[in-house]
């Protein structure tokens, strides 16, 4: 797919006026994965793991409905828009957890395929961090996709391996890499 370049993207807090159950109908969540990070013998290693990840329209609608539900209940969401079309989004949980630090979770963080590598993720991540600070957190907790590319993106944002693992989040996504960002 051709990359879309533009500088007139708008960034907004998500609400029922700008985000609905159909908002992700044109969203392209595609990733070709060739290698993933895995913890082997207590050490992180990059291992071959070839697959394609694609969100169907049905899954896009399920995720959109879930985002709508949570932004009305217990999360704050931010979106990047190209006109009326959402091209990236991030959500932050309002629940603070952790014993040694005060964490809030970055629940969703996605950029539509044709819009990646343009700074959209960096801007949405910054907005999510600002919200986490406002909520009183010390750190943002991220259960991050383990692919080589996803991990490179998180590390470029200065995310590091988590110091205090949330066992529930780790168990829910056992192949994710648990990461954090100090606010």
What is each PLM-predicted segment?
Residues 1-6:
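Short, Lys/Arg-enriched N-terminal segments with co-localized hydrophobic residues
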Residues 108-111, 117-130, 155-156:
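Conserved acetyl-CoA-binding loop-helix of GNAT-fold acetyltransferases
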Residues 132-145:
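Conserved GNAT acetyl-CoA-binding A-motif
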Residues 135, 156-157:
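Structural motif
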Residues 18-19, 26-102, 107, 112, ...:
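Acetyl-CoA-dependent GNAT
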């Amino acid at each position: 797919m051709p990359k879309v370049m533009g500088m007139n993207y708008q960034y907004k807090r998500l609400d029922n006026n700008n985000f609905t159950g159909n908002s992700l109908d044109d969203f392209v969540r595609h990733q070709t994965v060739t290698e993933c990070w895995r913890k082997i013998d207590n050490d992180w290693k990059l291992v071959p793991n070839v697959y394609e990840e694609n969100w169907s329209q049905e899954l896009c609608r399920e995720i959109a409905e879930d985002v709508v539900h949570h932004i009305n209940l217990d999360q704050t969401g931010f979106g990047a828009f190209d006109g009326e079309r959402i091209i990236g989004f991030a959500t932050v949980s309002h629940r603070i957890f952790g014993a040694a630090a005060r964490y809030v979770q970055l629940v969703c963080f996605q950029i539509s395929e044709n819009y990646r590598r343009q700074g959209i993720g960096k801007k949405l991540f910054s907005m999510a961090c600002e919200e986490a600070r406002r909520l009183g957190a010390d750190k943002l907790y991220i259960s991050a996709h383990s692919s080589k590319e996803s991990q490179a993106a998180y590390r470029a944002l200065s995310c590091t391996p988590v110091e205090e693992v949330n066992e529930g989040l780790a168990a829910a996504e056992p192949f994710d890499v648990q990461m954090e960002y100090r606010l």
